[in-house]
Amino acid sequence: SGYAPKAVKEIQGHDEMAWRKLAQLITALENEKADQKMVEAVRKESLNHKVPVLGITGTGGAGKSSLTDELVRRIRLDQGDALRIAVISIDPSRRKSGGALLGDRIRMNAISPWSSGQRVFMRSLATRDFGSEISAALPDVLAATKCAGFDLIIVETSGIGQGDAAIVPH
């Protein structure tokens, strides 16, 4: 992709430009258009970043987005809004267009900037035709998000069936 970053250092940091570059890289990963050297660099660099990944899964309508929002809110309150949190929300793809429904963002109130500035990065991923409740790009997206320097990564699956255990290895 023409806009995707070419070096890991471009996605590191917590300013708007670094987050924009991270979002562009995620888009390139999702569309399988990321520079292969960059993908390898991200995979290698991510091994140096031990970031907890919390997977939230369940059936449709179980309250995954509400739970995610409440967890983010409480973490921000309990930690004095000091932690940087990434939320990766995996949405089912529409069969016609292949795009994500993006319904989760409607329920997310705690992701907006508070007095200490932007602390929560949220990105939706489409399942595409992967045949799972997670995106095929998820492992590389998690690697990129770890490289970006977040303190916690929350992954919310699409929850479309009983195969939600696919999040466990991540």
Region roles according to the model:
Residues L29-V51, A62, L71-I167:
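Nucleotide-state-sensitive switch-loop elements of NTP-binding domains
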Residues L67:
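Hydrophobic positions on the alpha1 helix immediately C-terminal to the Walker A/P-loop
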Residues S1-V53:
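Extreme N-terminal, non-catalytic leader segments
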